[in-house]
Amino acid sequence: MDMVAHAEINNLSFVYADENEKALQHISLSVQKGEFIALAGGSGSGKTTLLKHLKKELLPIGKRTGDTYYDGTLLENVPDLLSAQEIGMVFQNPENQLVMDTVIQELAFSLENIGLPSHIIQKRIAELISFLGFQDLLHQSVHTLSGGQKQLVNLAAVLVMQPKLLLLDEPTAQLDPIAAKEFLGLLKRINEELGITIVLSEHRLDEVIPLATRVICMNNGRIVYDGSPKRVIANMWEVEGFRPFIPQIPRLFLEWNAKDIPFTVREAQMKMNDFSAISYVNEPIVQREKQEVILSAEHISFQYEKNSPLILRDLTVSIEKGKWVALVGKNGTGKSTLLTILAGLQKARRGKVKWNGKVIHKIDSKERFKSIGYVSQHPYYHFTFDTVWDEVYERARELYGEQGKEIAEQQLKKFWLYALKERHPHDCSGGEQQLLALCTTLLSKPTLLLLDEPTKGLDPWKKERVGELFRKLQKEGTTIVMATHDIEFAAKYVDQCMMLFDGAVIMNDAPKEFFSGNFFYTTSINRFIRKELPYALTWEDVYEACPNDMLHS
């Protein structure tokens, strides 16, 4: 007798209200108990829409055909209480799910809503906190937590319901590399020790693939590959358009035509036969000629309230004209705050910011708004209109008058948004919202770009195109300062990296020196082969240096 699938989708197609293009096309999928499924695919490929079709409360509004079942029951017929308890969902933005003031209130909230007695609530919270190990956070205000801690609380608030199926939509998109590793490690424990089934949508596959029992790759609302991680990665390798989605370590070994593909640093090192064969010379890094300082922060200190801790303390930094600078560091170290101060959106408690030699707050606001482009880590903060078209067209018309319509059309096509022009910005995927915010910001051709997590939510292919666009802007004289958790992107593209810690810049160097000196804040490729190739940061760096006869036969 066949086992009943934990969740099952039969020939599901879906079109959002007021749209013509199908978001999902003929999806058939069976999820077995205990699986750890990674959903991969481009921005807007249907991953989030598919996840929402596995929980009845999240079913999007539109026209659908086909059926979805949970434990053999049609999803629409699953009792509300059962759905709330057994199917949990964690979203991309840590801020969006928190509703209470303290951590313990957040954990108790959902249990109180389903009417559990207080002694059961206390027992569940105590047991869960012991499992997760964050007793110290229990009575803290959720507003004082870092992004990683907030996402941990979101996960805990779902786990306290003792779910059987856990859905996660890019849960590490806003987490620093260390917090992301900790979060994903916790998901592995939940899956292995508690037997909870996990379906996870994620662009950063480097850390997810080794955990997954199965990978599903989507494109244009369809499932194109479905199978074991090794099988799906091999299938993706056969199609040029999917190769950017393959994580760095397996990508390197596929380039080497290896038969058995490793996914982790340990597996990769075990496959290397003879490191002495490396044809590489550690030449000194060429120092670039220093340029004029265009932006400076001098002895900046900042706190949100008079008696609150300092976010930035006596921070001094100089940005040279035409440079692309990455700010990295843990959630809560002040990267976003520094960007808003550099943009003139917030004023430092002490110290001065100068742009082109002028104190930033003494520059006319209209001139500042046109010449300095700022994109928040929450792109929806930028949206004021009801359609993607209006967001871009109204700004283009304001800047260019009668030419605005033509320029808006060109800009939307440039950022792969033209097909979405009638969609409400808040109905776009996280990556599409990111592109829309960039699209409108770049209309004024700013000479200084201040970007907070610009690659968040972007699939690897679009990320490469955005990287190329920023390089082109650099060549035209644009200066870029970018806060990012995307170590691979920074390693590949930027000129300079700065690490913030305890409110100050503690490291400031070119990418090769910066990342080769780090243990955690570096790329998977560098961790794999740092002793032999200390400055290798990408698979391309290693491929150029290492012949493929170094592999075990």
From Swiss-Prot:
Organism superkingdom: Bacteria
Natural source organism: Bacillus cereus (strain ATCC 10987 / NRS 248)
Mode of membrane association: Peripheral membrane protein
Keywords noted in UniProt: ATP-binding, Cell membrane, Membrane, Nucleotide-binding, Repeat, Translocase, Transport
GO CC annotation terms, alphabetical: ATP-binding cassette (ABC) transporter complex
Binding annotation for ATP 1: 41-48
Protein's UniProt name: Putative ABC transporter ATP-binding protein BCE_3323
Entry GO MF terms: ATP binding; ATP hydrolysis activity; ATPase-coupled transmembrane transporter activity
Subcellular location: Cell membrane
Main location: membrane
Residues that hold ATP 2 according to the record: 329-336
Domain ABC transporter per the UniProt entry, residue ranges: 7-245, 295-527
Function: Probably part of an ABC transporter complex. Responsible for energy coupling to the transport system.
Record-listed E.C. numbers: 7.-.-.-
PROSITE patterns in UniProt: ABC_TRANSPORTER_1 (PS00211), ABC_TRANSPORTER_2 (PS50893)
SUPFAM superfamilies reported for this sequence: P-loop containing nucleoside triphosphate hydrolases
Family note: Belongs to the ABC transporter superfamily.
